[in-house]
Curated annotation (Swiss-Prot):
Entry annotated with the keyword Lyase: no
InterPro entries (alphabetical): Clx_II_MBL, Glyoxalase_II_hydrolase, HAGH_C, Hydroxyacylglutathione_Hdrlase, Metallo-B-lactamas, RibonucZ/Hydroxyglut_hydro
An example Gene Ontology biological process: methylglyoxal catabolic process to D-lactate via S-lactoyl-glutathione
Species per Swiss-Prot/TrEMBL record: Stenotrophomonas maltophilia (strain R551-3)
UniProt-listed NCBIfam families: GSH_gloB
Protein name (Swiss-Prot/TrEMBL): Hydroxyacylglutathione hydrolase
Binding site for Zn(2+) 1: H52, H54, H109, D126
Residues reported to bind Zn(2+) 2: D56, H57, D126, H164
SUPFAM superfamilies associated with the record: Metallo-hydrolase/oxidoreductase
Length: 254
């Protein structure tokens, strides 16, 4: 099965797993047009996986349902996704095109955000980005921490397939927070080179994120010290670190 990413809008990725017969599992199709362009060449959409209700992730679903009647649309338990045909939550499994997709509840960016992972890939939506995480629109720092801990416990060899190309901008903040991290410096240089060549910085291994992403490293001494210095006081616990780090990122200007 082949992994591919379609670009949409300014920086979205629509991830797809395509089998040898041209059938696809499509993740977060905010825009139907790039998927339909492949459908005109023979692609068949078997299933759609949705991580959360934001329109840049679900906006293309009605057009895909019109093109592929009966297509499965698998989404979180969320009334703001009326196109869903199946709703799933923490610990459930979805079988599609012979692959098993495990469902994780990862609230923070939204209250009902989920992620899907196979034995090879993590489709994280807007919960986890390379070198960053999603802004807290509906969740709490405590929920965000729990979600990051859950994602941080996944196998290191999984490939992170997140929904936005934010790596270069996230790297600037991450290096500001963790300037002595040599692995982070290397990741930034690689990402800059990729973008100069108009290449995607994704997917990336979770192992790399474990080494470089400050939101997966709130328990470490460098991140705690940096957040404490930014706040002008000692942090209380990991929730305090996460809250301070997320608020810092929200207002950060390079």
């Amino acid at each position: 099965m082949r992994l591919t990413a379609l670009t949409a809008f300014a920086d979205n990725y629509i991830w797809m797993l395509i089998d040898d017969d041209g059938a696809a599992v499509v993740v977060d199709p905010g825009d139907a047009a790039p998927v339909l362009a492949l459908a005109d060449q023979g692609l068949r959409v078997d299933s759609i996986l949705l991580t959360h209700h934001h329109d840049d992730h679900i906006g293309g679903v009605p057009a895909l349902q019109a093109r592929f009647p009966g297509v499965r649309v698998i989404a979180p338990v969320e009334e703001r996704i009326p196109t869903a045909t199946e709703r799933v939550g923490e610990g459930e499994r979805v079988q599609a095109l012979g692959r098993m997709f495990h469902v994780l509840s990862v609230p923070g960016h939204t209250r009902s955000h989920i992620a899907f992972h196979t034995a090879e890939h993590l489709f994280s939506g807007d919960s986890l980005f390379s070198l960053g995480c999603g802004r807290l629109f509906e969740g709490t720092p405590s929920q965000l921490l729990a979600s990051m801990l859950k994602l941080g416990a996944l196998p290191a060899q999984l490939l992170l397939c997140c929904a936005h190309e934010y790596t270069v901008s996230n790297a600037v903040f991450a290096r500001h927070v963790d300037p002595a991290n040599a692995a982070l410096w290397q990741r930034q240089e690689e990402a800059l080179a990729m973008r100069r060549d108009d290449r995607s910085t994704l997917p990336v291994t979770l192992a790399n994120e474990f080494d470089c992403n400050p939101f997966l490293r709130v328990h470490t001494a460098p991140i705690r010290a940096s957040v404490s210095a930014h706040l002008g006081r000692d942090v209380v616990d990991d929730v305090d670190v996460m809250a301070g780090l997320r608020h810092w990122k929200d207002g950060f200007r390079a």
